[in-house]
Amino acid sequence: MNNIIKMLNDEQMKQDVPEFGAGDTVVVKVRVVEGGKERLQAFEGVVIAKRNRGLHSAFTVRKISNGEGVERAFQTHSPLISSIEVKRRGRVRRAKLYYLRERSGKSARIREKLAK
């Protein structure tokens, strides 16, 4: 029974998900259906949380839009997600960056991780 569930989960998982973590700036392209039309909507922001649970993995992205903080949670292996692109690697010391909710401006900046 357990093997059947694992096999079904592995079948539904996406293989093209890039490696990213908290502090990274990502662009998530989401399929949006409006009326009868389908289009891609880009959501760019900083990953503030990531939850690794196989097929049920999720991550939260935060951005500032018109001076207002906007957060959106995505299921990593959702069929609605067209692509995930990592724009910038961030250097942080925490797994969850919920403290960014209280900060704005320069104090909310994240250092960039330099490749070796």
Swiss-Prot record:
Instruction: Give GO cellular component annotations, separated by semicolons.
Output: cytosolic large ribosomal subunit
Concerning Gene3D superfamilies, the annotation shows:
2.30.30.790
Say if the entry is tagged with keyword Zinc: no
The intrachain disulfides are none
Task: Name the UniProt key words of this record, in alphabetical order.
Answer: Ribonucleoprotein, Ribosomal protein
Q: Which GO terms describe its molecular function?
A: structural constituent of ribosome
Give the UniProt record's GO annotations in the biological process aspect.
Answer: translation
Query: Is Ribonucleoprotein among this UniProt entry's keywords?
Result: yes
Assigned protein family? Belongs to the bacterial ribosomal protein bL19 family.
Describe the function of this protein: This protein is located at the 30S-50S ribosomal subunit interface and may play a role in the structure and function of the aminoacyl-tRNA binding site.
Name of the featured protein: Large ribosomal subunit protein bL19
For this protein's source organism, the top of the classification is: Bacteria, Pseudomonadati, Pseudomonadota, Gammaproteobacteria, Alteromonadales
